[in-house]
């Protein structure tokens, strides 16, 4: 595949970054990810707006405008579409690191002040298809989400160590499960790239935005709830709420909306998967994007 690296479109296996890049050394970088539906990029503007907010939070100047990133992203996708099966779609990622420190630039004197990458990869449709048939098993590990008074969860940065540690802990318990982190107060926060919704008595609730990354798919889902006349509230939620839920689902760029089978082995009260509210939102999401991504996943079973 072709990637964009610092002003050039190059083959993926030729895109190299200095070993002393601060994104590699310190996790000093930011990124955002969108996806295609039927080979068309979805909500790129919203993703780039979030990307820009994270760059400002990190005081990181990419040397590119968001209009530049839009053009580059579209070009990367278009150059790689011939490599993609007509039934597949891409994840598309924009990534910026702080590049090299002044001390390290002696070995790479021409390296720009920021490292800028835009690349794409096929979505793991086959690996995730079972989640749409059976639902996802979630486990909350002992690792907690970094508190907002330390680092804002609203910034999408390279620092995913708490998610990685959570994934390792959960994988040791159940390789089929995904981790979902609690915050330092014991409230539900987020998974590695996913937000959570709880359904109780046909009313929905999701953790407050100030404690989680404000997912674009999360916002799309809230808008779909309003369109369908479903009440949705942003509030603190803990495991008591999850264990008493009728339905649970997660949202993310790649998953869109995916039902949860269990959390810490506890099953929601509605035994069908997906439950009726989740199913109605999946249908509305499919209609919104004008592409049946739900069947796209199920066809890989």
Q: What feature does the model see in each segment?
A:
Residues 1-180, 184-187, 213, 223-301:
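Conserved alpha/beta cores of soluble small-molecule-handling proteins
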Residues 179-180, 187-209, 214:
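Glycine- and Gly-Pro-enriched alpha-helical subdomains that act as flexible
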Residues 217-218:
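Secondary-structure junction motif
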């Amino acid at each position: 595949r072709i990637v964009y690296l610092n002003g050039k479109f190059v083959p993926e296996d030729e895109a190299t970054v200095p070993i002393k890049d601060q994104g590699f050394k310190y996790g000093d970088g930011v990124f955002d990810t969108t996806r295609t539906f039927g080979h068309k990029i979805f909500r790129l503007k919203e993703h780039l707006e979030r990307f820009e907010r994270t760059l400002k939070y990190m005081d990181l100047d990419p040397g590119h405008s968001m209009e530049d990133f839009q053009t580059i992203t579209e070009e990367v996708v278009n150059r790689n579409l011939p490599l993609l099966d007509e039934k597949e779609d891409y994840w598309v990622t924009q990534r910026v690191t702080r590049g090299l420190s002044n001390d390290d630039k002696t070995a790479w004197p021409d390296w720009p002040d920021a490292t800028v990458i835009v690349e794409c990869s096929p979505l793991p449709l086959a690996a995730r298809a079972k989640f749409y048939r059976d639902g996802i098993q979630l486990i909350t590990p002992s690792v907690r989400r970094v508190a907002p008074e330390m680092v804002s969860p609203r910034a999408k940065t390279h620092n995913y160590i708490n998610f990685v540690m959570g994934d390792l802990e959960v994988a040791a318990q159940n390789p089929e499960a995904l981790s979902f982190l609690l915050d330092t107060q014991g409230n539900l926060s987020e998974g590695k790239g996913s937000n959570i919704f709880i359904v109780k008595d046909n009313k929905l609730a999701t953790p407050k935005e100030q404690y989680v990354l404000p997912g674009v798919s999360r916002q799309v889902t809230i808008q779909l709830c309003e369109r369908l006349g479903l009440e949705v509230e942003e509030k603190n939620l803990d495991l008591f709420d999850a264990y008493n839920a009728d339905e649970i689902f997660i949202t993310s760029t790649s998953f869109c909306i995916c039902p949860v089978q269990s959390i810490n082995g506890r099953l929601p009260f509605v035994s069908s998967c997906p439950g009726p509210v989740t199913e109605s939102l999946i249908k509305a999401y499919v209609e919104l994007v004008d592409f049946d991504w739900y069947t796209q996943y199920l066809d890989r079973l």
